[in-house]
């Protein structure tokens, strides 16, 4: 926390406030007098306004400031530094008689005044005219230019003991200074101030303290800008001697010692003392705010050095290091928060790049003893240098640079060496000026001397020159003039004409061979061959240029072997015929070729592509989807003797005459040097090969069974073509050396695959994920290997596993995939199911409990497809009741050709249905688009040992996707083909059930009677529609999801949508997209476009889809073409369109149409997207529950890990993460005690309502008479506009209630005036001290009333910390990140932000009232909440344990608890409740004294109690310091409010331990009549807290009417809110809550008349709920239909149709 009880201010304040009144008064007088003296002495010198940050910096240099800094100045910082040096520092070094040089008369006058009381200082003045402006500055100045001969100054020297020169010496050269000192005869001490940036001597070209000054260097001139402003700037020469001279001689040969007295910024105070004394050899200058530019990381644009302020960069750097994943946006946002109108674009660009480098650099490493390898590696890189490290190990170089910058991220320090500078010899024939020292090197040769002369000629400006010190003066120096001239001649002789762009090779020709083909590392275990330079085309030229060796030239000119072309005849039969032996050869693949495997049809041929790993095969002009890898191809490669590297197979079936022109199989997916094997079956063909260089063509005739091999490298040197002579001839082409499929780019992924995040492959980085690798540890133990070894193996076999481990744990499907990749058999035992995978190793049994995997000695179980499916957490168990009528109706539609195209009267299929009485158990996997609802099922069917399964898909394209992802032993068919055969499958999977015709599931169950039926789909997407059978199947129309009964899970997250997707408030895990929604009119090349109608699709042609056609597909990007037809689309259709793209979604819409759709569109989702709003999580849940009432929505993917990853939830708020105690939760079993419950059957008669509630808005006053007019303007609390999309209406239920919004300034100021009180800290402390002791007496009354005993133990604090932590992070990740600013450590703990609570004041007594003040909300820093939150929870628990059963604290409890309490303890309608006035504001220092007593009773540590006291006394906000009061939103608000309420009630009423009472904050209720007590009237009168005693037959508690029959909410309130939500379009978000509240009144039945409730409003409300009952969860809807014999509403006999009644009736 920013304020500590141990701080100096608090410690002194404690002593101060505990003193006697006389001592406190004396201290005040003493300090006030001292302050007055200081302000008087410094008046006018330090009154200029500067930011607090600069004030803090300058205070550290000893500067004082006025308490009222109100004056303005063009350059206030420089002005106050000058004043400090002139008036505060310099006088300390003056003598009694001081001669002041170059200082205005006004300043000397002020010097006399400011120092009149300190010493008797006499000042003599001397000014000279040099610059033109001196005529305006000085009054009696002299025109003397020669510093060494200032006659008038020398005349005044006799009267002085010291000379002070003000800001002039910086213009003097050393010679001038020496001559000036030589002119002095009496004075032996000169004090002088200068302005000279020390950065100049360190070689910097810009200021390192830019807040105080900046400068420019131009032609050895320095232009100095005070405060960086041109106003007041001046030019001076660059004089190195100013800071570097320690001693010198004057013109008379006398020694002078120069010493620095003080430095602030560029202002220095020096003294020159006659004589030679000890002085410093160097001075350190560190009063800068800029990080050393030489230590700053250089970016790609690092041309100039960056000058970055440390106070901005250091907090931002620490913030980025705290983030789990630093990003540029967060970095710039943090910098913006710190800068506060001092923005610097260089800093913004730097932190943005810094964030990216931190994210990309493996900065953190293990600590501990280094191993030998790391020591040698570090030593090697240290010796080799940074350039070598950068070339050969860029990650190491980046990490070193970043670590170096972090370590050196401090303000700059400059060390200036000082030396003796001798005097100038009078009468010398040369002038010493700016000549670099050159020391003769005896070993220097002629060329080096020439080089020196060149440097001198090029770099020096023609000036008078000499040398400062001549070594060996008087001796002769031999100059090798002839050698120098000869060297010039040699250099000129070898110069040749410049050649541009001519390649030069700097290595031997033999070494050059390796640059033509080398390996590139793709991953930890994968490499690919590549070329750095192109191959040699002209051998003779290459030989002459030395590019190739003679041996290589001979090999190229006279090759011993050509690229291998092998022709293999598999038999000796006549060409064109097929013998018996041919049939035996390649038998399996021959059968495969005859099947309907060909997925695409091209000109003259059909194509089928197979691969072991790749999803797709692309080439110029087309691409083919992989069909997996058939077992027949394995047999083919074995017959041909090929290894597993041949992983691509292209099967083509030709027509007679079909051909392909000359081409080479050199697609990017194949590496150079691979072989191509072609098998010719079922016919003859001509195969021609052409050499690229010579054009020579070789022709081969292929017959049935021939195999043709093109050897390595042939695709780079030859081309080939083929012509088929036989209809049905098949060509099978096998390829190897494909690019590693793990390294393929994202745009080559299957459109059905979800994007995966890239993996940091460093194993060291994965060590911190040990908690997520429980199964890998089990693998390691089982294989008897170390965990790092297993990680390395897994990284090579299944990188996806490590990606998921890094993300917090891997899924169950990934565990199965890993088992298959390692050929490692496992048996998985779960709480609901069992599955096993085949393999060649000893089987490992794994037990999964609560997301944790551990090995155990298990035995193989008998589990099938159902048991394997039940292992998945996203799989639910439901029941489906077959409707034989719907099944028969659909079968007849198939038979008549109305539905589908394959089945009909001539192909009836197997659609015989039988009677099925009992509901059929079904397994479900329902989820959001991209949630992976089919992934677990596909994993089982691909890798697990299960019987043959039939998969039914509604469309062919979805069928092809299933075929590619599951084992070939299973059958995948479209929805019609499913009835054309038996298939022999006992288990059936139906995909995308929403796209199937109504009655389809009924027909499948009736016809196939499966053992296990699995249903997959998404209720949020489109449903089946066809014009051909729309009328025929109209009677069967249904919501198929609603027919599946049971508590079914729904996966509400997406692997498809990008991580930065803001359309939906769910977790999205796809690859980030630069932009998610873009409004554009242009369609990208080949981009899929989604339109509303089939007519538009047919008009536009290829690449256009209707919404329903895209369901189940995904695209890299897509365009949604909006027209007027989208206004009629449902939310489900819009959901499909918005979830098809993994990247960008383009929306084509005109501005006029967009505005129209926002107003009139039927889809709420479409409206929100067009308005740029997010579809909230609650809206998604409501949409799901409309179709699946009892669903359990899962917002996070189930992971196999040892612990819950709370850190991932807090990733967006790293500071909050550091404040919370992240405990591993220990599940404790709650002991359930069954209590006897007497059921009360209710028979409710729904009478007709007169709907009097509708008349309420018609009695309202006009808006202008209800609003308040304040100094801040008129309030805006009454809504007379009505509802969006409707005509303005001032008489709606909205207008009944006041609406407080954050943009209503007038209401906010009214609320501040009413709710807040302001007082400074000292006043709060005094008032708190005066009332000390009253809290102890009040709490004693409370303890006596409830007979509280002293406690010696408290509930477990760790448990309370866990509950507090879970409460803080139960919010969505996005919301936590949004409030991350409250976790900023720079937020002071005693500072809070005040907001107006946005709410609609729906209370019965507030209907139709005039505008009133709202409720203020206080926003505290998270440091305060986390400091006190857990211990306050512990205290509240302890209080509850001490209170009797009859006393209820209604907090975080269900309505049923309050209802149960009322039925137990309330005996009559009469009750007592208290109505407090300004409850929060009234909790002043007296209540604080009470709170301290309560905290001591509950054993709070004294230091924590003192900290709580200080925080309450020191509260402040932007409006000022606050008095002691309670704030809504404060830590412990509910607890302290409740305690205060209870203590007040104990003093106000005659009550005891057995009096039943309810408390909740400022609400209190007790059955019956409480007698008012007068015993403590005097004490209560002292309190600001006042209460009105309210006794009535209609008592209220927390908005509930209390009665012996239970609780009931005022029905008019619920009905008003219902109608507002209904017409606002938000009813789905609050429907459940309104129904629950209304159910308590509904269950009272005839007792409603006893409670005296508005029965007419209650009946209207219940009728509204019953109409919407089908949208409620089953448990809630059951509250309104408990009785089987419930009667229909009067006048509404037709409300429940037979179908609806049967659908919702409780079985």
Swiss-Prot record:
<keyword id="KW-0347">Helicase</keyword>
<dbReference type="InterPro" id="IPR007094">
    <property type="entry name" value="RNA-dir_pol_PSvirus"/>
</dbReference>
<dbReference type="GO" id="GO:0046872">
    <property type="term" value="F:metal ion binding"/>
</dbReference>
<dbReference type="Pfam" id="PF13532">
    <property type="entry name" value="2OG-FeII_Oxy_2"/>
</dbReference>
<protein>
    <recommendedName>
        <fullName>RNA replication protein</fullName>
        <ecNumber>2.7.7.48</ecNumber>
        <ecNumber>3.6.4.13</ecNumber>
    </recommendedName>
</protein>
<dbReference type="Pfam" id="PF01443">
    <property type="entry name" value="Viral_helicase1"/>
</dbReference>
<feature type="domain" description="RdRp catalytic">
    <location>
        <begin position="1469"/>
        <end position="1580"/>
    </location>
</feature>
<keyword id="KW-0378">Hydrolase</keyword>
<keyword id="KW-0223">Dioxygenase</keyword>
<dbReference type="InterPro" id="IPR043502">
    <property type="entry name" value="DNA/RNA_pol_sf"/>
</dbReference>
<dbReference type="GO" id="GO:0006396">
    <property type="term" value="P:RNA processing"/>
</dbReference>
<keyword id="KW-0548">Nucleotidyltransferase</keyword>
<dbReference type="GO" id="GO:0016887">
    <property type="term" value="F:ATP hydrolysis activity"/>
</dbReference>
<dbReference type="InterPro" id="IPR002588">
    <property type="entry name" value="Alphavirus-like_MT_dom"/>
</dbReference>
<feature type="binding site">
    <location>
        <position position="729"/>
    </location>
    <ligand>
        <name>2-oxoglutarate</name>
    </ligand>
</feature>
<feature type="domain" description="(+)RNA virus helicase ATP-binding">
    <location>
        <begin position="892"/>
        <end position="1051"/>
    </location>
</feature>
<dbReference type="GO" id="GO:0005524">
    <property type="term" value="F:ATP binding"/>
</dbReference>
<keyword id="KW-0696">RNA-directed RNA polymerase</keyword>
<feature type="domain" description="(+)RNA virus helicase C-terminal">
    <location>
        <begin position="1052"/>
        <end position="1182"/>
    </location>
</feature>
<keyword id="KW-0808">Transferase</keyword>
<dbReference type="InterPro" id="IPR027417">
    <property type="entry name" value="P-loop_NTPase"/>
</dbReference>
<dbReference type="GO" id="GO:0008174">
    <property type="term" value="F:mRNA methyltransferase activity"/>
</dbReference>
<comment type="function">
    <text>RNA replication. The central part of this protein possibly functions as an ATP-binding helicase.</text>
</comment>
<dbReference type="GO" id="GO:0003724">
    <property type="term" value="F:RNA helicase activity"/>
</dbReference>
<dbReference type="GO" id="GO:0006351">
    <property type="term" value="P:DNA-templated transcription"/>
</dbReference>
<dbReference type="Pfam" id="PF01660">
    <property type="entry name" value="Vmethyltransf"/>
</dbReference>
<dbReference type="InterPro" id="IPR037151">
    <property type="entry name" value="AlkB-like_sf"/>
</dbReference>
<dbReference type="InterPro" id="IPR027450">
    <property type="entry name" value="AlkB-like"/>
</dbReference>
<keyword id="KW-0547">Nucleotide-binding</keyword>
<keyword id="KW-0067">ATP-binding</keyword>
<dbReference type="Pfam" id="PF00978">
    <property type="entry name" value="RdRP_2"/>
</dbReference>
<dbReference type="GO" id="GO:0051213">
    <property type="term" value="F:dioxygenase activity"/>
</dbReference>
<feature type="binding site">
    <location>
        <position position="720"/>
    </location>
    <ligand>
        <name>Fe cation</name>
    </ligand>
</feature>
<dbReference type="InterPro" id="IPR005123">
    <property type="entry name" value="Oxoglu/Fe-dep_dioxygenase_dom"/>
</dbReference>
<keyword id="KW-0479">Metal-binding</keyword>
<dbReference type="GO" id="GO:0003723">
    <property type="term" value="F:RNA binding"/>
</dbReference>
<keyword id="KW-0408">Iron</keyword>
<feature type="binding site">
    <location>
        <position position="663"/>
    </location>
    <ligand>
        <name>Fe cation</name>
    </ligand>
</feature>
<keyword id="KW-0693">Viral RNA replication</keyword>
<dbReference type="GO" id="GO:0016556">
    <property type="term" value="P:mRNA modification"/>
</dbReference>
<keyword id="KW-0560">Oxidoreductase</keyword>
<dbReference type="GO" id="GO:0003968">
    <property type="term" value="F:RNA-directed RNA polymerase activity"/>
</dbReference>
């Amino acid at each position: 926390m920013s304020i500590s009880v141990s701080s100096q201010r608090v410690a002194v304040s404690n002593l101060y406030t505990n003193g006697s009144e006389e001592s406190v008064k004396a201290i005040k007088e003493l300090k006030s007098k001292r302050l007055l003296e200081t302000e008087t002495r410094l008046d006018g010198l330090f009154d200029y306004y500067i930011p607090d940050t600069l004030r803090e910096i300058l205070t550290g240099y000893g500067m004082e400031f006025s308490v009222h800094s109100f004056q303005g100045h063009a350059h206030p910082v420089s002005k106050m530094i000058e004043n400090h040096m002139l008036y505060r520092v310099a006088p300390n070094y003056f003598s009694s008689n001081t001669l002041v040089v170059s200082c205005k008369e006004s300043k000397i006058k002020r010097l006399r005044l400011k120092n009149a009381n300190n010493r008797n200082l006499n000042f003599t003045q001397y000014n000279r005219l040099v610059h033109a402006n001196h005529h305006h500055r000085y009054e009696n100045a002299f025109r003397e230019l020669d510093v060494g001969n200032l006659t008038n100054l020398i005349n005044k020297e006799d009267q002085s003991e010291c000379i002070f020169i003000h800001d002039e010496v910086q213009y003097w050269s050393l010679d001038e200074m020496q001559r000036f000192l030589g002119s002095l005869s009496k004075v032996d001490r000169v004090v002088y101030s200068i302005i000279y940036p020390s950065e100049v001597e360190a070689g910097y070209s810009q200021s390192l303290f830019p807040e105080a000054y900046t400068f420019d260097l131009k032609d050895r001139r320095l232009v100095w800008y005070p405060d960086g402003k041109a106003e007041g700037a001046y030019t001076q020469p660059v004089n190195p001697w100013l800071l570097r001279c320690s001693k010198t001689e004057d013109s008379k040969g006398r020694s002078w010692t120069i010493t620095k007295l003080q430095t602030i910024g560029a202002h220095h105070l020096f003294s020159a003392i006659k004589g030679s004394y000890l002085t410093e050899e160097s001075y350190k200058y560190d009063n800068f705010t800029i990080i050393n530019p030489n230590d700053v990381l250089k970016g790609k644009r690092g041309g100039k050095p960056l000058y970055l302020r440390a106070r901005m960069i250091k907090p931002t750097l620490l913030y980025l290091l705290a983030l789990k994943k630093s990003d540029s946006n967060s970095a710039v946002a943090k910098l913006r928060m710190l800068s506060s109108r001092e923005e610097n674009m260089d800093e913004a660009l730097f932190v943005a790049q810094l964030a990216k480098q931190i994210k990309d650099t493996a900065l953190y490493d293990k600590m501990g003893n280094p191993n030998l390898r790391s020591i040698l590696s570090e030593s090697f890189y240290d010796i080799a240098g940074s350039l070598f490290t950068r070339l050969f190990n860029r990650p190491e170089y980046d990490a070193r640079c970043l670590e170096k910058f972090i370590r050196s991220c401090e303000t700059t320090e400059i060390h200036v060496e000082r030396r003796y500078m001798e005097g100038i010899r009078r009468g010398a024939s040369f002038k010493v000026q700016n000549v670099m020292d050159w020391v003769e090197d005896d070993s220097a040769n002629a060329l080096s001397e020439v080089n020196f002369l060149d440097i001198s000629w090029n770099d020096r400006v023609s000036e008078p020159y000499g040398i400062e010190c001549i070594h060996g003066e008087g001796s002769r120096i031999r100059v090798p003039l002839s050698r120098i001239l000869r060297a010039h001649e040699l250099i000129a002789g070898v110069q040749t004409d410049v050649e541009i762009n001519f390649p030069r090779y700097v290595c031997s020709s033999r070494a050059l061979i390796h640059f033509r083909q080398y390996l590139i590392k793709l991953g930890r275990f994968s490499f690919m061959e590549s070329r750095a330079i192109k191959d040699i085309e002209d051998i003779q030229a290459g030989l002459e240029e030395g590019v190739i060796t003679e041996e290589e030239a001979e090999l190229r000119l006279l090759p011993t072997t050509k690229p291998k072309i092998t022709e293999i005849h598999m038999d000796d039969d006549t060409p064109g015929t097929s013998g018996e032996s041919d049939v035996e050869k390649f038998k399996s693949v021959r059968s495969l070729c005859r099947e309907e495997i060909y997925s695409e049809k091209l000109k003259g041929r059909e194509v089928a592509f197979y691969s072991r790993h790749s999803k797709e095969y692309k080439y110029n002009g087309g691409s083919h989807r992989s069909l997996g890898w058939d077992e027949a191809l394995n047999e083919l490669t074995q017959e041909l003797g090929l290894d597993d590297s041949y992983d691509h197979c292209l099967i083509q079936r030709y027509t007679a005459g079909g051909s392909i022109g000359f081409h080479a199989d050199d697609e990017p997916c194949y590496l150079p040097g691979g072989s191509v094997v072609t098998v010719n079956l079922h016919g003859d063909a001509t195969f021609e090969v052409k050499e690229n260089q010579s054009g020579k063509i070789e022709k081969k005739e292929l017959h049935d069974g021939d195999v043709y091999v093109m050897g390595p490298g042939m695709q780079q040197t030859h081309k080939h073509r083929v012509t088929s002579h036989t209809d049905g001839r098949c060509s099978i082409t096998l390829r190897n050396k494909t690019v590693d499929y793990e390294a393929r780019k994202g745009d080559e992924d299957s459109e059905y695959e979800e994007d995966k995040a890239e993996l940091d492959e460093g194993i060291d980085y994965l060590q911190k994920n040990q908690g997520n690798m429980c199964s890998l540890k089990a693998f390691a133990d089982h294989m008897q290997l170390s965990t790092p070894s297993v990680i390395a193996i897994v990284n090579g076999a299944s990188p996806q596993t490590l990606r998921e481990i890094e993300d917090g744990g891997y899924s169950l499907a990934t565990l199965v995939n890993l088992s298959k990749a390692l050929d490692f058999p496992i048996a998985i035992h779960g709480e609901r199911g069992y599955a096993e995978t085949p393999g060649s190793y000893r089987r490992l049994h794994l037990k999964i409990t609560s997301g944790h995997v551990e090995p155990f000695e298990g035995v193989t179980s008998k589990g099938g497809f159902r048991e394997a499916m039940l292992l998945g957490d996203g799989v639910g168990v439901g029941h489906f009741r077959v409707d034989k009528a719907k099944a028969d109706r659909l079968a007849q539609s198939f038979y008549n050709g109305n539905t589908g195209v394959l089945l009909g009267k001539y192909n009836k299929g197997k659609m015989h249905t039988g009677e099925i009485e009992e509901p059929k158990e079904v397994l479900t996997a329902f989820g959001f688009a991209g949630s992976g609802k089919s992934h677990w099922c596909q994993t089982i069917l691909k890798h697990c040992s299960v019987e043959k399964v039939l998969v039914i898909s509604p469309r062919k394209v979805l069928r092809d996707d299933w075929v590619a992802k599951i084992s070939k032993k299973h059958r995948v068919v479209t929805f019609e083909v499913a009835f054309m055969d038996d298939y022999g499958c006992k288990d059936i999977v139906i995909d995308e059930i929403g796209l199937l015709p109504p009655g389809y599931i009924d027909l499948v169950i009736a016809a196939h009677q499966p053992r296990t039926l699995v249903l997959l789909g998404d209720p949020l997407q489109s449903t089946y529609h066809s014009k051909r059978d729309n009328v025929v199947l109209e009677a069967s129309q249904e919501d198929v999801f609603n027919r599946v009964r049971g508590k079914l899970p729904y996966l509400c997250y997406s692997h498809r949508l990008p991580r930065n997707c803001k359309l939906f408030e769910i977790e999205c895990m796809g690859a980030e997209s630069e932009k998610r929604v873009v409004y554009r009119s242009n369609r990208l090349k080949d981009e899929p476009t989604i339109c509303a109608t089939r007519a538009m699709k047919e008009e536009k042609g290829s690449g256009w889809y209707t919404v329903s056609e895209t369901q189940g597909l995904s695209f890299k990007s897509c365009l949604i073409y909006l027209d007027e037809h989208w206004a009629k689309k449902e939310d489900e259709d819009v959901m499909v369109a918005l979830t098809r793209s993994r990247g960008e979604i383009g929306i084509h819409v005109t501005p006029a149409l967009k505005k129209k759709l926002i107003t009139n569109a039927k889809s709420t989702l479409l409206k929100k997207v067009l308005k740029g709003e997010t579809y909230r999580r609650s809206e998604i849940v409501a949409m799901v529950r409309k179709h699946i009432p009892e669903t359990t929505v899962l917002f996070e993917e189930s992971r196999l890990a040892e612990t819950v990853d709370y850190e991932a939830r807090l990733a967006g708020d790293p500071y909050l993460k550091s404040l919370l105690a992240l405990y591993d939760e220990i599940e404790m079993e709650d002991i359930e005690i069954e209590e006897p419950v007497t059921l009360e059957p209710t028979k409710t008669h729904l009478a007709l309502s007169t709907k009097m509630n509708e008349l309420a808005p018609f009695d309202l006053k006009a808006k202008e008479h209800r609003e308040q007019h304040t100094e801040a303007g008129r309030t805006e609390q009454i809504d007379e506009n009505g509802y969006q999309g409707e005509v303005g209406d001032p008489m709606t239920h909205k207008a009944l209630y006041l609406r407080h919004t954050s943009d209503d300034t007038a209401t906010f100021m009214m609320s501040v005036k009413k709710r807040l009180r302001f007082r400074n800290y000292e006043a709060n402390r005094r008032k708190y001290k005066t009332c000390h002791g009253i809290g102890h007496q009040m709490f004693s009354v409370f303890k006596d009333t409830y007979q509280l005993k002293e406690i010696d133990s408290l509930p477990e604090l760790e448990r309370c910390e866990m509950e507090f932590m879970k409460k803080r992070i139960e919010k969505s990740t996005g919301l936590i990140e949004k409030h991350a600013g409250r976790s900023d450590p720079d937020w002071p703990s005693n500072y809070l932000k005040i907001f107006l609570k946005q709410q609609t004041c729906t209370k019965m007594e507030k209907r139709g009232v005039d505008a009133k003040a709202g409720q203020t909300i206080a926003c505290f820093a998270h440091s305060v909440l986390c400091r006190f939150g857990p211990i306050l929870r512990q205290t509240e628990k302890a209080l509850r344990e001490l209170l009797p059963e009859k006393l209820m604290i209604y907090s975080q409890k269900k309505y049923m608890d309050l209802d149960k309490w009322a039925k137990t303890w309330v005996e009559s309608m009469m009750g007592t409740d208290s109505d407090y006035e300004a409850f929060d504001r009234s909790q002043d220092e007296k209540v604080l004294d009470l709170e301290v007593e309560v905290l001591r009773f509950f054993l709070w540590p004294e230091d924590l109690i003192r900290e709580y006291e200080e925080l309450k006394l020191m509260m402040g906000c932007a409006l000022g310091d606050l008095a002691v009061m309670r704030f809504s939103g404060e830590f412990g608000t509910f607890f302290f409010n409740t305690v205060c309420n209870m203590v007040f009630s104990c003093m106000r009423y005659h009550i005891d331990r057995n009096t039943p009472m309810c408390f909740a904050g400022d609400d209190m209720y007790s059955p019956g009549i409480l007698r008012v007590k007068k015993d403590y009237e005097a004490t209560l009168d002292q309190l600001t807290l006042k209460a009105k005693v309210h006794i009535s037959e209609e008592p209220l508690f927390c908005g509930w009417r209390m009665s012996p029959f239970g609780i009931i909410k005022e029905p008019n309130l619920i009905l008003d809110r219902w109608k507002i939500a209904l017409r606002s379009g938000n009813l789905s978000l609050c429907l459940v809550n309104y129904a629950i509240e209304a159910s308590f009144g509904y269950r009272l039945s005839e007792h409603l008349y006893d409670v005296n409730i508005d029965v007419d409003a209650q009946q209207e409300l219940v009728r509204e709920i019953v109409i919407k009952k089908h949208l409620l969860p089953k448990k809630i809807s059951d509250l309104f239909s408990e009785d089987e014999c419930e009667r229909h509403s009067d006048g509404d006999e037709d409300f429940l149709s037979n179908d609806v009644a049967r659908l919702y009736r409780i079985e």
